[in-house]
Amino acid sequence: MSQHPLRPAGSRPGDSPPDGSCPDGLAGGGSAVGGGGGGEAGPGAAGADDLVIAGRAYGSRLLIGTGKFASHRVMRDSLVASGATIVTVALRRVDIGRIGDGDVLDFIPPSMTLLPNTSGAVDAAEALRLARLGRAATGTGLVKLEVTPDPRTLAPDPLETLRAAELMVADGFTVLPYCSADPVLARRLEEVGCATVMPLGSWIGSNRGLRTRDAIEAIVASAGVPVVVDAGLGVPSDAAEAMEIGAAAVLVNTAIAVAADPARMARAFALATAAGRLGFLAGRGAAGPATVASASSPLTGFLGAHPSPASHPSPASPVPSVSRATSPAAVVGEASR
């Protein structure tokens, strides 16, 4: 099991239990459809349907954030429960002087891949500066690019995001940009060399769900890199919906962190993400017209072929008696007792 860069060897505060256990048996196991995979195999061990970013395989299609948790230990338990293999952390929250002595990084299981983010950056220059600090502190060239100058909506600035992406790619970073759900911008980000595009589902931290579905479907249809739906997913069914329309992965933070039981919610999101992916791979059947039903079972010929006219008793023939014990009414009566 690899150690985070700059993290001293040995036991430290917040390390996950040696057996990988999690409260209430919520640990997220691996899955061929991305429902977990945060165990010893770790990123890079290719599976049947792994998420692949910049040529590297990850066993879970659920990415998870680290903000807003009540404590570092609650965060750690939720990370383990999620089964995620990629965890994002705001570079502004990392205290380089305290790494190994209670910093947030010390509570992230070492098997997880760190994805530093530039949360709080208001322009391309600041985002690049934060990314370089993160690379120096963590040793990773992965970066989740965020440029959000509007404090009210935290909407990504499309011009500064594209400019920052160009600068970061030129500087050797593997860039995963948070962006508006704009198919044209997504294509431009891919063209400058971003490893993914990460369109928002709704405003950051809003828990309002997938409000940009049509635009994300358009992005998925033309993207040549993984599409990761980021921001606003509020309940597990939102994650399932994003995966069902073809997203490669989802990133969730607030919905898990502010839940009454964060670890259990993390596991729920893992299962929903896996279910949505499996549903996408299975292929949805064509939707029928809104005003016409289509029976899933035949409406005639139950229990065999149609009886011939000769099998019906003639009016002159006595109708066979049916004993109470075998009459439909008797059967219903017996069953209801």
Curated annotation (Swiss-Prot):
Q: Which UniProt keywords apply?
A: Cytoplasm, Schiff base, Thiamine biosynthesis, Transferase
Q: In which pathway does it act?
A: Cofactor biosynthesis; thiamine diphosphate biosynthesis
Catalyzed reactions: [ThiS sulfur-carrier protein]-C-terminal-Gly-aminoethanethioate + 2-iminoacetate + 1-deoxy-D-xylulose 5-phosphate = [ThiS sulfur-carrier protein]-C-terminal Gly-Gly + 2-[(2R,5Z)-2-carboxy-4-methylthiazol-5(2H)-ylidene]ethyl phosphate + 2 H2O + H(+)
A family per Pfam? ThiG
Checking InterPro entries in the record gives: Aldolase_TIM (IPR013785), Thiazole_synthase_ThiG (IPR033983), ThiG (IPR008867)
A GO molecular function held by the record? thiazole synthase activity
Q: What residues bind 1-deoxy-D-xylulose 5-phosphate, as annotated?
A: G205, A231, G232, N253, T254
User: According to the UniProt record, where is the region Disordered?
Assistant: 1-41, 302-337
Keyword check for Ligase, yes or no: no
**A GO term (biological process) for this protein?**
thiamine diphosphate biosynthetic process
**Gly residues bias: where?**
26-41
Q: What is its EC number?
A: 2.8.1.10
Top-level enzyme category: transferase
Enumerate the active-site residues.
K144 (schiff-base intermediate with dxp)
Q: Where in the cell is it found?
A: Cytoplasm
Give me the stretches of Low complexity compositional bias.
10-25, 319-337
The terms describing its cellular component in GO are: cytoplasm
What does the function comment of this entry state? Catalyzes the rearrangement of 1-deoxy-D-xylulose 5-phosphate (DXP) to produce the thiazole phosphate moiety of thiamine. Sulfur is provided by the thiocarboxylate moiety of the carrier protein ThiS. In vitro, sulfur can be provided by H(2)S.
Q: Record's family?
A: Belongs to the ThiG family.
Q: How does it assemble?
A: Homotetramer. Forms heterodimers with either ThiH or ThiS.
Q: What is this protein's record name?
A: Thiazole synthase
Tell me what organism the protein belongs to. Answer: Frankia casuarinae (strain DSM 45818 / CECT 9043 / HFP020203 / CcI3)
